[in-house]
Curated annotation (Swiss-Prot):
Native organism: Serratia proteamaculans (strain 568)
Similarity comment text for this entry: Belongs to the universal ribosomal protein uL13 family.
Superkingdom as given in the UniProt entry: Bacteria
Keyword check for Ribonucleoprotein: yes
GO BP annotations listed: negative regulation of translation; translation
Annotated protein name in UniProt: Large ribosomal subunit protein uL13
Tagged with keyword Ribosomal protein: yes
NCBIfam families cross-referenced by the UniProt entry: rplM_bact
A GO molecular-function descriptor: mRNA binding
Pfam families assigned: Ribosomal_L13 (PF00572)
Gene, per the UniProt record: rplM
Function: This protein is one of the early assembly proteins of the 50S ribosomal subunit, although it is not seen to bind rRNA by itself. It is important during the early stages of 50S assembly.
Keywords: Ribonucleoprotein, Ribosomal protein
Length: 142
């Protein structure tokens, strides 16, 4: 019997909505990355994007343990000499709460074109409203 390989055109992708309210950031991001890759499906193939679309709501209410709210630091670089910028978790949540979940999940996905395609299926919103009602997403309890 030959090994089954999923074809990109035959993959069925579902839409799921996840509420991040009170969820621990790392544990939530791990499960989101797993589902974006498609590892929860029997037809998972490493070189094919078999994952689902995921909508994350209430990104500003995501939880972190310990002192990470004040001690966890995110770094970025402007591209100019001496242009390193830093922001704590608290500042990131205040300024752009969606970005915190996006950074956590993106680091858990493959690097390269396939990983970027998987990351594009993640939709993160700060509040409880989203613009994907037409896709009829199912509620996913993580």
């Amino acid at each position: 019997m030959k090994t089954f390989t999923a074809k990109p055109e035959s993959v069925k992708r579902d839409w799921y909505v996840v509420d991040a309210d009170g969820k621990t950031l790392g544990r939530l991001a791990t499960e989101l990355a797993r589902r974006l890759r498609g590892k929860h499906k029997a037809e998972y193939t490493p070189h094919v994007d078999t994952g689902d679309y995921i909508i994350v709501l209430n990104a500003e209410k995501v939880a972190v343990t310990g002192n990470k709210r004040t001690d966890k630091v995110y770094y970025r670089h402007t591209g100019y000499v001496g242009g390193i910028k830093q922001a704590t978790f608290e500042e990131m949540i205040a300024r752009n709460p969606e970005r915190v979940i996006e950074i956590a999940v993106k680091g858990m996905l493959p690097k390269g074109p396939l990983g970027r395609a998987m990351f594009r299926k993640l939709k993160v919103y700060a509040g409880t409203e989203h613009t994907h009602a037409a896709q009829q997403p199912q509620v996913l309890d993580i």
